[in-house]
Amino acid sequence: MAAPYDVQQVEAYWRHRWETEGVGRVDLDAVDPSDVFVNLVEYPYPSAEGLHVGHVYRYAGVDAYGRYQRMSGTQVFQPIGFDAFGIHTENYALSVGEHPVSLTARTTARFSRQLSRIGCAWDWTRVIDTSRPDYYRWTQWILVRLFEAGLLYRAEAPVIWCPSCLTVLAREQTERDGTVCERCESPVIEKVMTQWFLRMTDYADRLLAGLDDLDWPERAKRLQRQWIGRSEGTEIAFGDLIVFTTRPDTLPAVTFLAVPPGHPAAGGARPHPMTGAEIPVFEADYVVEAYGTGAVMGVPAHDERDRRFAMAQGIATSHAELLDPQAAAAVGAPAVRYRLRDWLISRQRYWGPPIPIIHCAACGPVAVPDDRLPVLLPEIEDFRPAGTGESPLASVHDWVATTCPSCNGPARRETDVSDTFVDSAWYFLRYPSTEFDDRPWDADRTAKVLPVDFYAGGPEHVQRHHLYARFMTMALHDLGLVPFEEPFPRIRIGGLIVKDGAKMSKSRGNVVTPDDYVGTVGADALRCGLLFSAPWEQGGEFTDAAIAGIERFFAKTRRVITGPDREGPHERTLGRSIHAVTDAIERFTFNVAIARLMELLPEVGSADSKRIFVRLLAPFAPHLAEELWHRLGEPFSVHTQPWPQSAASSDDELVDIAVQVDGKLRGSITVPRDASERNTCEVARREVSAVPAVATRVVYVPGRVVNFVTGGR
């Protein structure tokens, strides 16, 4: 009979021992640069009462990968922190009637407890909190450097305003073609305001070109390319109205011009550059002022959208002959345009780092000197957004009034704060240097440890945080402040875990907290239950049935590992399993790795196979593996042991199988060469979402293809 296993006691004991003995921590001064592996996941917003299991799904996968890397011989640096400043936390504070200062202290403490209890190998000695002065001092320092370089500027421009959040938004913070706020989903409006921008468009070509060399999912790279939106075309003058087009050959068929709502040319007319005929100018919602020149040609004969608009407005259609390439090239000037706009970073809110600029009537905008940083955020009782276009800080008159650093004359502080995405655009640079209070990052430490070797994030950040961080790193590199241009050479995007068929959210009432499970079945069961639910990059449905299945697997594991030794498994079987688990981890199909462990367990009998099995289990169930390693009489810790190796060739043992549904290719899987039809079908159902749970029949060609026939067409 297996020894009793008190999951709460066991997990608490090993977590305490890992922390006190520094398992997983890296001496960044002593480590060889070739050995260090930075394993980073996007830090959370502490803008709720705690984590939900969707967070655990993402973190557990990253932690499993980090533990595998450590056992494979690298020195894994895996820090964590809190994206505590910004609208997410402030809106939550407003909703619960608590000041952001006290709320952030409370929520980060709770998040820390939860992050610790799920068993991830965080380096708790290097936690960052973006709302602390020792962090945002350096956010402000970076903005000063960018201001001095001409990359931070203030200008009047049409901006996106959220009437609900009562602040401007960057275009990247809108959804549904720029019509709603990504945070509150309220319709947004356009205003003309004076705001602070970063010259991200100066880096458009480099941001595009750099994507080619990054190990990112193709979809993520495609989304960034689309967002940057480089177009080569022609600028054509209709009088004083300049139009950008990629189809200059259609110029003879132009019957109207379209501009965005509110454009001063709307309602007038402009001369056709070829005929001199007056072409009417219409307002059209589909024209984006920030793209091209803000005016487009209307060619109903050659564009379906233009045709529909012309019919609605009663505009004639011309079927004039298209220009030949030579004539088309002569009608205007070649031009390159981008969808990307400069990054609007100022916010009319309270909870953020004050932008470190002083306004002087004589000197203009002046950067706050380094020795006066940080510009501390004053604690005010009424932090609600005013909705007037000014931050609540504008009402703190004693704080606003100051002297000019250049002429010592009377001046006033900038009252806008910088957006939370400025904080996260550089946070990875701070992690290795948290002990330095006289610099944002140590040059030698940064060159040794960074860039990030592996970064995991969510799909919602591909066109926001990931893009901003790339721009920021390139800009800092150009200023000679960091030795690399790309912060995240390798990224993987975690899928979403859903409950009751929908993404977890408080509004849907389907949020599941990890505490509900860690306090009963334990962190290991929750981690493995989540990772077993679906391929990590794909995501899937979270069910209690998966947790129950993992509990049964764990109980059997304890019986086998602590039971008497016996023969087995065959060396080839063990070798195939090592290869399969290793390959699955490398592919981030942790569900396949756990399934392979389940298949291997009944074969485990010898003392050597038990030690190998426990090491294979360690990345997924770290507490259980540590306890079983201890019960086998092995030295602490299993997580510092070498990853199991096999002499067999993985090329000989594994094959790729095409997965079809009704004869159409839906994906592929990797299985052992001698996998049975049943096991192959199980892997296909887990890994390929299009595979039905029930099929009329299955056609299986060993080593080549499996086709699920549903009878549909």
Pin down the residues of each PLM region.
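Amphipathic alpha-helical
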Residues: 200-231, 252-266, 371-403, 613-642
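Helix-rich, typically C-terminal accessory recognition domains appended to large enzymatic cores
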Residues: 144, 148-165, 238, 245, ...
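Short Cys/His-rich metal-coordination motifs, predominantly Zn2+-binding knuckles/fingers
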Residues: 165, 182-186, 275, 361-363, ...
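Basic, alpha-helical terminal appendages of large translation-related enzymes
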Residues: 1-34, 296, 316-322, 331, ...
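Conserved phosphate-binding loops in nucleotide/dinucleotide-binding enzymes
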Residues: 94-95, 102-103, 170-201, 243-244, ...
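Structured ligand/cofactor/substrate-binding pocket environments in proteins
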Residues: 54-66, 83, 135-138, 154-155, ...
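N-terminal, positively charged nucleic-acid-binding surface of large information/translation enzymes
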Residues: 1-260, 300, 312, 472, ...
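Active-site-adjacent bridging/hinge elements
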Residues: 33-41, 115-119, 277-287, 428-450, ...
